[in-house]
Amino acid sequence: MESQRNILLIGLLFVSFLLWQQWQTDQAPQPVATQSSSVVTASSASDSHSSDVPDADSALPAAVVASKDLITVNTDQLIIKINPVGGDIVYSALVEHKLELENDEPFVLLEQTNDINYIAQSGLIGRDGIDSSVKGRAHFDSASRNYSLAAGQDTLEVPLTYVAENGATYTKMFIFHRGKFDVDVDYVIDNKTDKQLQVQMYGQIKHSIKKSESSMMMPTYRGAAFSTQDTRYEKYSFEDMADKNLDKKTLGGWAAMLQHYFVSAWVPPANDQNIIFSSISAGGQANIGFRGAIFDVAPGATQEITSQFYVGPKDQAALSAISPTLNLVVDYGFLWWLAVPIYKLLMFFQSIVGNWGAAIILITLTVRGLLYPLTKAQYTSMAKMRNLQPKLAEMKERFGDDRQKMGQAMMELYKKEKVNPMGGCLPILLQMPIFIALYWVLLESVELRHAPFMLWITDLSVQDPYYVMPILMGVSMFVMQKMQPMAPTMDPMQVKMMQWMPVVFTVFFLWFPAGLVLYWLVGNLVAIAQQKYIYAGLEKKGLK
């Protein structure tokens, strides 16, 4: 009877977890398409100079520069297009990440079309800045319209130059690195005037307000996030932006836009005082970025201002190399402390076997192996409880409705027979956090995107296209259920719920990532084998 209740407990915990996730999604306000001017001016311009940051997106896409005028950069990882007006990155494609499994086209992250405006903007503001919401953007010159990282070349520099009316020369340098998704975006100001220049660099990501393509089984986030010296990582959704503009002073920090598996982020120098800001423009664009330190450039002097921009997958190693907190955009939820070691163990197994499906099987065997002592104790406790059923039935008949005496007698019996009535629950309670943590690892880890297993399972990050594994998982649950003797005293309602549980789980798992179904299926098969082995040992001891 206890084993049946444990299976019910699994089902209730599992369904509760899914309902809780869906409730969080449903309770979030819907994205706002447009904002009034009062929201745009919520931050104090006198304090933060946020009004100096250009906000010319309301005219897009009519103002988009013709494709032939864009500067195209090709590396081993990125295809980047830069608008010479302002030097903004208006297009990025990830060479080694396909748009779809059966499509060789690269995944496009940043783009500027009739449907979406998602770009990375940077510039110089302040008294002598060349980018302004009032004066307009600088029009840069470049030696070529096409740049490529050649074979044997590890670094590619793309310089853009602008000569101001006062004679000062501004060079905006994009530096690309082989094997990397981060781009150095630096400014060099050559003050050829007889007056001191004052400039401040900013970088911001502009994104059309768009609702995340999320579901109960695959909850994902699309929106902004930031980090400061006081807040290591915080999501800041489009709804949050509509409610309140960010204006946080910090040493270092970063600002990012997130979506499933991919991220774009501005990372200013870690030792500089910066301001992380956000806004919603009148054209319905969500903006998040940074304003850096103010630099005074003496006459005849040269000043370099640096920053980094990352545009690519949520690769934890690559993100950590840029900023110690940027890898937190791979959000494992409240069980991150459990998910991180699971992820590292999964990576370790994959490095050995070279197959993510096999790695999931190995991690399942590891988890089941670690929990085996508890599993054995669970089945032993359940066997003892079954042997006590006649005595418990006798007590129930003897004490009738006197629950107090019945409870005291039961506790004395458990103590005498050395039985823990809750002993069967502990392994179940330990399995659920592991299951949920692995669920987030499989959902968030870009390494599993388009990762094949075998036969018809060509992508472990999406559902089984033929629903074979969910059905096998349901069958395995049914077998486990039949191996557990049904107590005659069990409530009829519980019996019905137990009979339907494999069906309910099968339906739920139809839309789960194949990797997660594989974990649960293998776990069930191992549990069946363990159960048969443990029961054989118990029968030798006279416990059935």
UniProtKB/Swiss-Prot annotation:
Pfam families in the cross-refs: 60KD_IMP, YidC_periplas
Keywords, alphabetical: Cell inner membrane, Cell membrane, Chaperone, Membrane, Protein transport, Transmembrane, Transmembrane helix, Transport
Membrane topology: Multi-pass membrane protein
Localization per Swiss-Prot or TrEMBL: Cell inner membrane
Entry GO MF terms: membrane insertase activity
Subunit structure: Interacts with the Sec translocase complex via SecD. Specifically interacts with transmembrane segments of nascent integral membrane proteins during membrane integration.
Record's function text: Required for the insertion and/or proper folding and/or complex formation of integral membrane proteins into the membrane. Involved in integration of membrane proteins that insert both dependently and independently of the Sec translocase complex, as well as at least some lipoproteins. Aids folding of multispanning membrane proteins.
NCBIfam families in the record: PRK01318.1-1, PRK01318.1-3, yidC_nterm, yidC_oxa1_cterm
Designated name of the protein: Membrane protein insertase YidC
Annotated source species: Shewanella woodyi (strain ATCC 51908 / MS32)
Underlying gene: yidC
